[in-house]
Amino acid sequence: MSKKQNSSISRKKIKRQILEGIAHIHASFNNTIVTITDRQGNTLGWATSGGSGFRGSRKSTPFAAQVAAEKCSEIAKEYGIKNLEIMVKGPGPGRESTIRALNSSGFKITNITDVTPIPHNGCRPPKRRRV
């Protein structure tokens, strides 16, 4: 019995040059997720506060969100992105610091949109917390 050798050549994805991108920021109370996409919505890269080395309650700090945004800006620069449109979702503490970090990374921010989902009397919210 001869063994077949799998020719699984690990090919790196070819980085295409993109001028404009969208930064989706999901800022929850526990974590901040930053995703860079192209204009069609295809994901190019992402970073989170938890993935940046912060655990527990430190994930929900503005500094952790800033570090995640800086990680994401390096990914965007690999693709050659110059202009960013920012979409912010959620009420978390990392909203402002993420936008400031992306701005200071050298991107030209074209517009900032708040896309936080607001129910028009949808589902009943959970009961109030009593501590």
Swiss-Prot record:
PROSITE patterns: RIBOSOMAL_S11 (PS00054)
GO biological process: translation
Key words, A-Z: Ribonucleoprotein, Ribosomal protein, RNA-binding, rRNA-binding
Organism domain of life: Bacteria
Pfam families documented for this protein: Ribosomal_S11
GO molecular function list: rRNA binding; structural constituent of ribosome
GO terms under cellular component: ribonucleoprotein complex; ribosome
Family the entry assigns: Belongs to the universal ribosomal protein uS11 family.
Annotated protein name in UniProt: Small ribosomal subunit protein uS11
Native source species: Wigglesworthia glossinidia brevipalpis
Lineage, highest ranks first: Bacteria, Pseudomonadati, Pseudomonadota, Gammaproteobacteria, Enterobacterales
